[in-house]
Amino acid sequence: MKEPDAIKLFVGQIPRHLEEKDLKPIFEQFGRIFELTVIKDKYTGLHKGCAFLTYCARDSALKAQSALHEQKTLPGMNRPIQVKPADSESRGEDRKLFVGMLGKQQTDEDVRKMFEPFGTIDECTVLRGPDGTSKGCAFVKFQTHAEAQAAINTLHSSRTLPGASSSLVVKFADTEKERGLRRMQQVATQLGMFSPIALQFGAYSAYTQALMQQQAALVAAHSAYLSPMATMAAVQMQHMAAINANGLIATPITPSSGTSTPPAIAATPVSAIPAALGVNGYSPVPTQPTGQPAPDALYPNGVHPYPAQSPAAPVDPLQQAYAGMQHYTAAYPAAYSLVAPAFPQPPALVAQQPPPPPQQQQQQQQQQQQQQQREGPDGCNIFIYHLPQEFTDSEILQMFVPFGHVISAKVFVDRATNQSKCFGFVSFDNPASAQAAIQAMNGFQIGMKRLKVQLKRPKDANRPY
């Protein structure tokens, strides 16, 4: 019989030729097995290299996890076996609590006495720094989920301990998956400071921040048509916000109206700015002799308009706004590559077209796949090992796009099972972006995996990747 609190284990990194009868001798030494099932693809029936294991006794599962997880490598495998509670063993089975807002003077014994009335405590540890000083928080593990839940219901926010700045916090400790997601969110926020979009503007960051704010205001007025531009403006503002948080922008910029000039650049004539902005080998577009006002005033969208038509002819406001951005699209192709191709002319309201025939769809998919697999110049292509199984092309693109313009991002997939092989390539258009990505992401931990990020060796190198 299975105990009520028995744990269902996930077993990974097992050879695909091993079935249940082959795996049982490995796990039976730790206790009687209630159920062992190899996971197979529901469509192809192929072995997926993992299994679910449930012992009759909870202690047997804990012993197996302690003895095998990351400790033993099965024949034919490159990585050690994974033995850990399955995802289905979710918060309902948790017994470990996080306790916050403790007083700095409270010891392990003080915390244990506080929680002992609710049940049997397996572990109680106050977290401390290298110097032994309490961090004001602790972990407490009960024998059952019910005991842990009772402690939460009674103690959370019930009192403020001496030396604490707020009421007591008692909650279930984060799972490994939740910690991994939080780390990804933190790095996504921090990576903005590496963006070449922000760094290449240098001393004119105040000008560009004002420009992007005005662009955001412009696209908000035409949100029905310009959602990709709104997205790009939001991304750019996030990059600038990340730099501001690191002290690289000294002067805050407030949103300006269509007739005012941002305070941070009021003393600098715009005529002096394009000369410095002519970077990457591009020269600024000269103003046209069509009766334009003096260049020391900003226009409502933050840039000089360059209309394609005579001023006497009626000009669509949306077309004029786009024309005013063409100068910056030319000067910064990496920054606006997601925006410029989308609006070569104002979008027209047309009836929805029927989907293309299957043959045309297949050709389009092949073209997209070929485009995704393009590589950059030597020194611009990086290889990423140890990706999480669930990561797709879009996830690694989102992870690495803050470092620069990404030409392609590809996760390699097993053709037989359609499962990720847990490695992939990302190609940039310049070596500096690739090096910044390697320095920031090599060794970055997601869940129980640490990414290995390195340069892809040139094609003529006679060495394996």
From Swiss-Prot:
InterPro entries: CELF3/4/5/6_RRM1, Nucleotide-bd_a/b_plait_sf, RBD_domain_sf, RRM_dom
SMART domains: RRM
Residue stretches of biased makeup (Pro residues): 346-359
Any one GO BP annotation for this protein: positive regulation of mRNA splicing, via spliceosome
Localization terms from the record: Nucleus; Cytoplasm
Tissues where this protein is expressed: Expressed in brain.
Main localization of the protein described in the UniProt heading: nucleus
GO molecular function: 7SK snRNA binding; mRNA binding; pre-mRNA binding; RNA binding
Source species, domain of life: Eukaryota
Region feature Disordered, mapped onto this chain: 346-379
One GO CC term on file: nuclear body
PROSITE patterns tied to this protein: RRM
Keyword annotations from UniProtKB, A to Z: Activator, Cytoplasm, mRNA processing, mRNA splicing, Nucleus, Repeat, RNA-binding
Domain RRM: from-to ranges: 7-88, 95-175, 380-458
Regions of compositional bias (Low complexity) in chain numbering: 360-373
Role noted for this protein: RNA-binding protein involved in the regulation of pre-mRNA alternative splicing. Mediates exon inclusion and/or exclusion in pre-mRNA that are subject to tissue-specific and developmentally regulated alternative splicing. Specifically activates exon 5 inclusion of cardiac isoforms of TNNT2 during heart remodeling at the juvenile to adult transition. Activates the splicing of MAPT/Tau exon 10. Binds to muscle-specific splicing enhancer (MSE) intronic sites flanking the alternative exon 5 of TNNT2 pre-mRNA.
Protein family according to the UniProt entry: Belongs to the CELF/BRUNOL family.
Stated name of the protein: CUGBP Elav-like family member 3
Lineage per the UniProt record: Eukaryota, Metazoa, Chordata, Craniata, Vertebrata
